[in-house]
Amino acid sequence: FRSSIVMHGAIINANAKIGKNCIINNRSLIEHDVVIGDHCHIATGAIINGEVSVGNETFIGSGVVTKQCISIGNNSIISVGEILKTDVDSNIVVIS
């Protein structure tokens, strides 16, 4: 959690690892064994389910829900309300 900000009401469960200079916003849920890289922003109400890997400099929008055990690459943007069921490569914008 070095130099990271965890906002009011965010929940970070067992064995989750948060990189440097991240923002974990209000009412976000980071489940067990999640790894979040450096310089990431997890927006309000996002749910990152167990064993997900989030690359460096990635933005996860408000209300995003991820399936367990997926990987999100570096420098990616996941837009508001997306439901991620598969891996996302680096440098990708996911928007419906």
Where are these regions (language model features)?
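Extended, small-residue-rich solenoid/repeat segments and analogous flexible loops
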Residues: 1-27
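Glycine-rich hexapeptide-repeat left-handed beta-helix
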Residues: 26, 35-38, 43-96
